[in-house]
């Protein structure tokens, strides 16, 4: 009985904690309170064009202006689909008698768009939670470029993500500034099931492996970070080190691995007299190894890249040679 009560108490606490966490977030789009113009009814786009001729002519050339009534599931087409019934506004010419987007919050603006654009994970996404509205990226009235974007990729994204723009200028970067790919190749700005608006519903690595399929395996000899998370070693937006590595070699490898019989130990371990399998046990191969002040010893240590030997760093099907008992050294 006591055990059951303990479990019940735990579940109640868990439920309470979950409710507190959910309460911290904004309401989902379907629960956003919208303004209502009482007594207003639809009068048709022709009446709008009497005053807003330029805007209506431009709108007619956009994808929204060419939508057929059957495509909007009873929501109607034209100006009043978004702005609501215009009868009172036509009579009074008062901006307060019609829904004006400039007076709406970001959540309210997006709520109107989501009446038709339902196939997104917008609720709970980073953009939604940071009060980004659809209109910060899209222009509705003028017939602008692809997908009604106010700015094309990546410039539109860089308007807010200036830190990412800076990283894209690093020597090692994905070919975004060369025009070979864009932010939306990896990110879905309208929301996703995982963090950072990534275009994957499962592992982060699955997104990387869409392009880097040769690194996927499975391999007989695996490298654990490849299975776990590519960003353990790589920074996808740009780095100073080659191959989008977070640090240069050997320092990035030394975050997890200690250096061993190669030249690093020549200046570190007095019991070591060599830096390769052939000279490891040869006395006197490196006389300066026993003098820790010798610059040449440490020069060899820190200018050696791990991938000079372990070049199959993402995994291999072949056992390593010349390394007794070390089949997983990923050297070939």
Label the model's feature ranges.
Residues 9-19:
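Bacterial N-terminal signal peptides
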């Amino acid at each position: 009985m006591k055990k059951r009560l303990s479990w019940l108490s735990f579940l109640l606490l868990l439920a309470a904690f979950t409710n507190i966490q959910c309460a911290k977030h904004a309401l989902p789009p379907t629960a956003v309170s919208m303004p209502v113009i009482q007594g207003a009814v639809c009068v048709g786009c022709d009446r709008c064009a009497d005053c807003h001729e330029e805007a209506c002519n431009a709108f007619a050339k956009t994808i929204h202006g060419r939508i057929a009534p059957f495509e909007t599931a009873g929501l109607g087409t034209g100006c009043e689909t978004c702005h609501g019934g215009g009868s009172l506004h036509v009579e009074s010419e008062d901006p307060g008698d019609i829904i004006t987007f400039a007076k709406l919050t970001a959540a309210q603006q997006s709520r109107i768009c989501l009446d038709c654009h339902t196939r997104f994970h917008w609720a709970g996404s980073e953009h939604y939670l940071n009060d980004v509205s659809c209109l910060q990226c899209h222009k509705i009235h003028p017939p602008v470029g692809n997908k009604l974007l106010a700015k094309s990729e990546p410039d539109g994204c860089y308007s807010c993500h200036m830190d990412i723009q800076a990283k894209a200028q690093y020597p090692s970067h994905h070919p975004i500034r060369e025009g070979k790919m864009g932010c939306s190749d990896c990110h879905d700005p309208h929301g996703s099931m995982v963090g950072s608006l990534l275009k994957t519903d499962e592992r982060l690595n699955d997104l990387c492996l869409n392009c880097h399929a040769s690194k996927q395996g499975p391999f007989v000899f695996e490298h654990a970070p490849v299975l776990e998370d590519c960003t353990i070693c790589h920074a996808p937006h740009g780095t100073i080190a080659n191959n989008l590595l977070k640090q240069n070699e050997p320092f990035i490898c030394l975050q997890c691995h200690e250096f061993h019989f190669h030249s690093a130990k020549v200046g570190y371990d007095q019991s070591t007299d060599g830096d390769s399998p052939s000279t490891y046990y040869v006395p006197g191969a490196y006389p300066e190894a026993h003098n820790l002040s010798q610059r040449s010893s440490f020069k060899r240590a820190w200018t050696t890249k791990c991938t000079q030997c372990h070049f199959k760093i993402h995994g291999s099907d072949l056992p390593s040679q010349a390394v007794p008992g070390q089949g997983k050294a990923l050297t070939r």
